[in-house]
Every structure is written in C-alpha cells, then in structure tokens.
Amino acid sequence: MKHLTEMVRQHKEGKTNGIYAVCSAHPLVLEAAIRYASANQTPLLIEATSNQVDQFGGYTGMTPADFRGFVCQLADSLNFPQDALILGGDHLGPNRWQNLPAAQAMANADDLIKSYVAAGFKKIHLDCSMSCQDDPIPLTDDIVAERAARLAKVAEETCREHFGAADLEYVIGTEVPVPGGAHETLSELAVTTPDAARATLEAHRHAFEKQGLSAIWPRIIALVVQPGVEFDHTNVIDYQPVKATALSQMVENYETLIFEAHSTDYQTPQSLRQLVIDHFAILKVGPALTFALREALFSLAAIEEELVPAKACSGLRQVLENVMLDRPEYWQSHYHGDGNARRLARGYSYSDRVRYYWPDSQIDDAFAHLVRNLADSPIPLPLISQYLPLQYVKVRSGELQPTPRELIINHIQDILAQYHTACEGQ
C-alpha cells in the first residue's frame, strides 16, 4: 500500500497531489479506468461499497473475493500490473443491516470486514455512523468510534492471519453524504466544522487506544468530511472554497492525515482541482462514471435507430425502461413527482439509479445486440458528430477508433481525465 502512504506523504510536503477512487463494479467503467491508468502510468484505486459487495453477495451478487478476482482478471487481460492496483472497501460497517438490532448488525459487520480484508482489500473505510434498529438517533461520536475500533481490531487480526502482517490503511469519518447522492432536492449544504472533525478524530483515537490499537494510528490516512459538495437528481452543489477554509486549515495540524471527499461527482474540473489543493485529496467518483456510460449508450441507441430497421433494433432504451418499471425497488423511493418527471429521472437523473439495472440479463442482451448492430459496418462520421461530438473530434484526429466499445470507453475516460488532472499535483 506504498502508493497511498506515499501520496499522503507527498501531499503533506506541499505537492498538492491526490488520488481518485473509482467506485463502480461495471465492467466497462472498470475497463475504462484500468486502460486510462495504464496509459498514464498511475496506480489505480478501485473501491467496492458495502451495498455492492458483501459476504452475502451485495446487489452485484459478488463477495469481496469475487470482486477482487473479477478486477484482477480484468487487469491481467489489459496487462495492468496488479501491484499498481489498490482495492478499497467503502462504508464498511452495519450499513446494510440498519433494520436489525445493533448486536446482530455489528456481528454481520465483523464478518463483512473479515471478508474484505481476507480477500486482499487494503484501504478500509470504517463507517459505523448509522443507527441500527434499537439505537438512538443520531448515535454519539463515542458509540460510532467504539464500533469502528471494534471493526479495526477484527481487520488487523484478519490481515495478520491471512498475510502474516498488518498493512491496512484506514479511512474514518461519519459526516458523509448519503451514499450515491442525496434523495431530496438540495439548495444549501453544511460544511463539516473543524470542531466536529476534531471531535470525530479524538473519539476514534480514544476508542482505538481502549482496544489496544494506538500503534495503527499512523495508518489512519484520511477522515471523511463534508466539504460542501453534493448532487441530487438535477442539481449540483459546487465546491465553495471560502466556506471550507477553516476545515482545510485544520487538517494541516495532523502529520499523516488528509481528507476524503465523497459525492464529488459532477463537480467542475476547477472545483475538483481546488478540492485536492485544499487537502480533500482522496476524491470518490462513482455515479458520474456510470452516468457517462449511460450517456454513451443512449447516444449509440439513437445512432442505431437512424441506421437499423426498427424491427432489427436492440430497443435498449425500451428494455431498460420496462425492467425499471417491473423492478422499481432501486428508484421508487428516490424519484418523485408525476409520471413524466419520474420517467425523466429514470433515464437522466444525476443520481443515476439506472446503474443498478445494467447487470440484468435482458438489459445485457439488449446492450450486446446494440453493439453487434453497430459493429457490422462503420458508423457514419456525421452521426458520431451529432451524438458523441467530443469523441468525433478524437475520431477525426485519428486517436480513437469509431467502434461502439471504444466510443463508450472513451466517453467514460473523459470524466476520468478530469479527476486525473485534479490529482496530478505539482
């Protein structure tokens, strides 16, 4: 895990560098990220969340060992060195089991941590901020920290048992946006106060001491805070550096610590760069990448309709809509308004709840059909110009092949490029 430790060390020395974390399990997003990191010769941090991947399979159907195998196999197929790959676990704690009593939820969380660490995940975000069935709302800093320390102890023991030494790096912090974007419409967002950040750190330090874990404190590399960035279905709250000045200055007093910013999706390139300069040096991105995937697929579906007789079309968009209506559990509680508003949200929302549906076999078949239809003969350049204008420029200059897969990958990489530039440092 020298990559992360070295990044933090350089940042603390004033290099204004950072690293972005790709939070997606979609094969095309991961291929885009691996190929981009390979081309730029940078390490790549890929994270699975406790919703996506857990000991029972999560919503992707993958355990941590499955996810690691899947990512490593993809990396090998693309000749990306595994020692440049960093795997992280995000929101690890009782998140999935909030409807259970705390004792039961935390027992599951213990097993969750064991499964991630045993599978070789090295960056561990301990998040015990959520109240369980029999807990007060909200939890106190002390309870949150005690639970995180308990999980850290499990993680350390598991790491030593499986790898002979404990080399994990931890992220702590409880003041995170709702995973995957806000449910409600936003207008203003409270930035974490320096006092709240200090209180979280001190509560965790004390809890770790009580568990006999003082020695691992230097491996706690980041604190999750809210720098004032978020998105809902149609709006983005942009980073305002002046509102985060006190918070940014506060972390300068901690020798081995930086901030981690969640929900940085859809921030402008300028905001992403400023976040890193202001010590929010780990930038999480997920929905913006699957949003770009969806944009590219909708564009290719529109091109297909121009080129292919209706009866031979994949009907990707209609298949997607039908599946989302048949299985509304991933969007129903998020999207509100009349029928038309919900239809638009299903297709176009920044929160990109459609990402939960790509693994569906019907949708996957339609996607394969779309790619086959467009791979049979070259896509006319004017249609690429019409529907994927940024890719058109690269096709015309000879740096991009106009095949369906390459157009999709490149469109996703346009987002990754913004994060790469933000994290490069000086």
Swiss-Prot record:
GO terms for biological process: carbohydrate metabolic process; D-tagatose 6-phosphate catabolic process; phosphoenolpyruvate-dependent sugar phosphotransferase system. One of its GO terms (cellular component) is plasma membrane. It comes from the Bacteria. Pathway: Carbohydrate metabolism; D-tagatose 6-phosphate degradation; D-glyceraldehyde 3-phosphate and glycerone phosphate from D-tagatose 6-phosphate: step 2/2. Gene3D superfamilies: Aldolase class I, putative tagatose 6-phosphate kinase domain like. HAMAP family: Tagatose_aldol_KbaZ. Component of the tagatose-1,6-bisphosphate aldolase KbaYZ that is required for full activity and stability of the Y subunit. Could have a chaperone-like function for the proper and stable folding of KbaY. When expressed alone, KbaZ does not show any aldolase activity. NCBIfam families: agaZ_gatZ, PRK15458.1. Forms a complex with KbaY. Belongs to the GatZ/KbaZ family. KbaZ subfamily. This is D-tagatose-1,6-bisphosphate aldolase subunit KbaZ.
